[in-house]
Amino acid sequence: MPTKFQLEEMLRAGVHFGHLARRWNPKMKPYIFMEKNGVHIIDLKKTLVMAEEALKAIEAIASTGREIMLVGTKKQAKVIIAEQAERAGMPYVCERWLGGMLTNFSTIRQSIRRMNAIERMETDGTFDMITKKERLMLIREKDKLVRILGGIANMNRLPAALFVVDIKKEHIAVKEARSLGIPIFAMVDTNCDPDEVDYVIPANDDAIRSIDLMVKAVADTILEARTLQVEQEVLAEMDEAAEEETAND
């Protein structure tokens, strides 16, 4: 897999800016280069190595056709998460994380089925047979479900992994994934506990450019792995067809 990052690029994106030193988590000490003006500066050489390791693991998962859920509900992350996850064809959560999204997935699936049912009502003539008040109530219900669950509407089973922006904010998602043994990839800022994550990417999880750089690299990696998977499947089918043709001659 070609290198996705350059140190200069990460510097321009502000990946190295951590939190105020007084708000740090001591467990992040190995990833901190220095303190400057009361702010911790992340060691980008370590970020570079660890990000590439994380992307290799993501590539391995995506190449088998399994799904990686992207999670980021903070203001700076939500648009990026939605755009990049949709581009990569992955499930995502960019609004509120509902408790039980992973640990009570069967109930969440019921809500998704309800959302799909209301959408069908809009097109199959059902809305023509109910009152205006009932229509408005159903539309409001659907809009709420779409806003919260739209990113996982096509997810039929638990994801193989999570990629998280800001594990402190998404602590419920992290806790659920850990309880189920689902690997967690994450941008981990200097105020967070890296022990909660399987693949730590020490990085500024507040700056839009930093988030965009990392999430885009994840989406690119998934797309490349999926493309390679399809190519390999086509080649395998061609080889199988050629063998059958040879056997029939």
Curated annotation (Swiss-Prot):
InterPro entries associated with the record: Ribosomal_uS2, Ribosomal_uS2_bac/mit/plastid, Ribosomal_uS2_CS, Ribosomal_uS2_flav_dom_sf
NCBIfam families to which the protein is assigned, alphabetical: rpsB_bact (TIGR01011)
GO cellular component: a single term: cytosolic small ribosomal subunit
Coiled coil regions, renumbered to chain: none
Any one GO BP annotation for this protein: translation
PANTHER family to which the protein is assigned, alphabetical: 30S RIBOSOMAL PROTEIN S2 PROKARYOTIC AND ORGANELLAR, SMALL RIBOSOMAL SUBUNIT PROTEIN US2M
CDD domains: RPS2
Pfam family, any one: Ribosomal_S2
Recorded GO MF terms: structural constituent of ribosome
UniProt key word Membrane: no
PROSITE patterns: RIBOSOMAL_S2_1 (PS00962), RIBOSOMAL_S2_2 (PS00963)
Descriptive protein name: Small ribosomal subunit protein uS2
Family, similarity comment: Belongs to the universal ribosomal protein uS2 family.
Keyword flag Ribosomal protein: yes
The entry's keywords: Ribonucleoprotein, Ribosomal protein
